[in-house]
Amino acid sequence: MKIKLRLNKSTIESVKADLIEKHIEISEDANLILTEENYAGDSMECRNETGVVFVNTESICYMESIGHDVYVNTNDKRYKTRYRIYQLERLLPSERFIRISNSVIIKKNSIRHIKPALSCKFYLTLTNGSVVDVTRTYYYKFKEFYGI
């Protein structure tokens, strides 16, 4: 059995030792991922036209789901990831990322402008120039976080 680890630096060595002792192989190309609850990873596995790349989470502006595909958008590039939006919501640290609709997660400090709209919505202009909307489902959570 192969497992990919997504653990904080404080616990990774002890978990690795336990898994190796139990004859479990640790590999980056494994289908199973063991993720710590408060894992604050610094990079995310994505794909572009040349292959697999690791995108630094600090450079991410927002992530969006379009159909069955999930895209990671930085200020200047767009990557595809195999993670689903609900997985990214759990994987990424909630101190830096917030879900604003069923299909979009933004980095909290990537907002350039907030424009209120009718019927419990906001339109956000992000640092890369994209405009995304906070839907009614996530409206109050967004307002509470930013103190609006």
What are these language model-derived features?
Residues 137, 141-148:
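Charged phosphate-binding loop/patch that engages nucleotide di/tri-phosphates or the phosphate backbone
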Residues 5-8, 132-135:
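Active-site-adjacent beta-strand anchor residues
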Residues 2, 6, 13-43:
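Short, well-ordered secondary-structure micro-motifs within conserved domains or adaptor modules
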Residues 32-127, 131-133:
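Conserved binding/recognition cores within well-folded domains
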